[in-house]
């Protein structure tokens, strides 16, 4: 078998179709920092960012409409979950009442304020939806426990008893992918800080949690697990590092093959801090983005190849088409991966 390995590698190179691995910039019509993006289809996507800004396209990004949520110019929308060209959630992150959750059902003309963080010391980090009605929201620890909220109707959110946090442990609001869901009930989220670098896992809609350690660096409040994604029920990738050291490859990636019970670092790390990772089911590829560049893997995250040097914060894919967003209103499309 060992002697056949070069043959298998050659076959992989021959049968795998050529893939145009690149981001093509688009015009966002805004200059604010963008942190969230959510693709609905090949034509419909939403994005979000600072100063109460949200964006939408219905023509594949040929045109993006940028708007500000009325009365929310102070909001930093770190997360967006789009459900159609009409319906979307916006999550703002900030201390106490600066953490808010909005929803639109009319394409973004009117936004309903669903919830304001009731704790002045709280800070919301991310939101994810299992389906149009069932979702979960994650916040930094309050009184020693992570702040977990869930919904079963898409409108009313109920606070759960979150899992206990270690001292100086928290989550990150860098790309709205530090919280990840799969199937009908499973959720994972990553942590950072000097006690962080851990991944929590729930199989019952966020009611109870188990936790595991990862090899991602967590030697400062700036370092830890920033993003998690799964390709199936067992195989996942977590990325991160230290966002203050964007070119440092130490502790930037971990892989699990048992649904997050254990995590291991591959032999090849990512070349620097990465804030988001995504799996493209259509092409069986993994993509990672961060402030120092983008990378692609075709072997489950074990090895990576840089393909773009621009700095992006977040990304979202539908099939083989997706968008990435970044500082200064940066937005780009990857088409036909």
Task: Give residue spans per PLM region.
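Bacterial N-terminal signal peptides
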Residues: 6-16
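Positively charged n-region of N-terminal signal peptides that target proteins for export
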Residues: 1-4
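Residue-level hotspots at or immediately adjacent to binding/recognition sites across diverse folds
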Residues: 20-337
């Amino acid at each position: 078998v060992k002697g056949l390995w070069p043959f298998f590698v050659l076959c992989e190179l021959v049968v795998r179709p050529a893939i145009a691995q690149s981001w093509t910039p688009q015009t966002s019509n805004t200059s604010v920092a963008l942190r969230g993006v959510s693709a609905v289809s090949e034509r419909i996507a939403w994005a979000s960012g600072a100063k109460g800004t949200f964006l939408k396209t219905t023509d594949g990004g040929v045109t993006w409409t940028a708007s500000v949520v009325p009365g929310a110019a102070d909001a930093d929308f770190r997360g967006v979950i789009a459900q159609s060209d009409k319906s979307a959630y916006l999550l703002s992150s900030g201390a106490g009442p600066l953490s808010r959750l909005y929803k639109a059902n009319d394409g973004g003309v009117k936004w309903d304020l669903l919830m304001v963080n009731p704790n002045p010391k709280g800070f919301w980090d991310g939101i994810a939806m299992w389906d149009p009605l069932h979702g979960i929201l994650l916040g930094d620890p309050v009184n020693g426990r992570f702040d977990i909220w869930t919904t079963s109707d898409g409108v009313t959110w109920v606070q759960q008893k979150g899992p206990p946090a270690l001292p100086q442990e928290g989550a990150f609001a860098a790309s709205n992918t530090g919280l990840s869901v799969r199937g009908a009930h499973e959720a994972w989220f990553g942590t950072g800080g000097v006690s962080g670098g851990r991944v929590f896992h729930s199989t019952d809609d966020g009611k109870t949690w188990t936790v595991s350690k990862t090899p991602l660096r967590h030697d400062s409040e700036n370092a830890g697990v920033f993003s998690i994604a799964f390709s199936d029920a067992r195989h996942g990738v977590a990325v991160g590092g230290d966002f203050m050291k964007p070119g440092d490859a130490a502790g930037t990636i971990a892989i699990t093959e048992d649904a997050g019970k254990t995590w291991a670092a591959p032999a090849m790390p990512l070349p620097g801090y990465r804030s988001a990772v995504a799996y493209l089911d259509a092409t069986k590829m993994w993509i990672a983005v961060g402030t120092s560049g983008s990378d692609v893997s075709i072997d489950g995250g074990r090895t990576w190849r840089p393909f773009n040097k621009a700095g992006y914060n977040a990304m979202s894919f539908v099939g083989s088409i997706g968008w990435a967003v970044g500082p200064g209103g940066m937005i780009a499309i990857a088409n036909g991966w």
